[in-house]
């Protein structure tokens, strides 16, 4: 666990003076891709400590807007690249990596994407491969666009979309969607083919930090320590995030 010393020390000291004793709740902002793991661990944390944890967030831009507005927040979970550029968050503790998944419309034939060759063949054969428009600035969108720009994926019919890639499956714009795996797995209208093969390192690193607007940085840090406890690695894995070192 790592927090920049000058900033975090000052923040923790202020929080110690400002926070009400026995704070009974925490607000956590998280994008949908990391939410299943955060939600599962939040329930365990509440059972262990009695501290209620509320999960909010949604899309990247919505989280940024909430932080900029100084709304209620104690802990923030974001792709590491986004968290680095977010002044409203103090410190950065790495969590792990979430893989990009391959999904098709529920009821459609699910392609075999278990090897690099089979993955490439499935994408080339598709009438359209949807993914988040990289112009929107999301880490997943930029990563997937870079992957599909490689010479070996020449001929893939790319369908960059605004918002969630899986919406293009329902509209018929594409028959394959590349999106963060937990998001695909959580949608009943999508059949998950699996993750992009590891050879392509198609995953987004996530980290967490303390929101500058928190009124209890000590409790926020305690929750972050719980999130990164090695004993909770299995919970993360079951919800689509592979902790670093596992």
Give, region by region, the residue ranges found by the protein language model:
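N-terminal secretory signal peptides that target proteins for export/translocation
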Residues: 1-4
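Bacterial N-terminal signal peptides
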Residues: 8-20
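Exported/periplasmic ABC-transporter solute-binding proteins
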Residues: 24-61, 65-71, 80-98, 104-246
């Amino acid at each position: 666990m790592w927090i920049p010393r000058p900033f975090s020390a000052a923040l923790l000291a202020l929080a110690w003076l400002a926070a009400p004793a026995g704070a009974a709740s925490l607000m956590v902002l998280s994008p949908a891709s990391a939410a299943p793991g955060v939600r599962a661990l939040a329930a365990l944390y509440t059972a262990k400590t009695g501290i209620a944890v509320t999960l909010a967030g949604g899309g990247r831009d919505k989280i940024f807007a909430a932080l900029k507005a100084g709304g209620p927040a104690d802990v923030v979970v974001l792709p590491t690249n986004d968290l680095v550029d977010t002044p409203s968050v103090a410190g950065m503790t790495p969590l792990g990596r979430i893989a990009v998944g391959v999904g098709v419309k529920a009821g459609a034939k699910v392609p075999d994407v278990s090897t690099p060759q089979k993955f490439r063949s499935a994408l080339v054969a598709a009438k359209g491969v949807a993914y988040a428009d990289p112009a929107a600035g999301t880490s997943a969108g930029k990563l997937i666009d870079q992957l599909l720009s490689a010479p070996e994926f020449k001929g893939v019919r790319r369908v960059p979309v605004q918002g969630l890639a899986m919406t293009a499956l329902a509209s018929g714009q594409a028959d394959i969607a590349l999106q963060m795996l937990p998001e695909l797995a959580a949608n009943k209208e999508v059949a998950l083919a699996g993750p992009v093969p590891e050879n392509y390192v198609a995953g987004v690193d996530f980290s967490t930090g303390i929101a500058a607007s928190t009124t209890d940085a000590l409790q926020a840090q305690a929750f972050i320590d719980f999130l990164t406890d090695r004993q909770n690695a299995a919970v993360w894995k079951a919800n689509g995030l592979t902790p670093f070192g596992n």
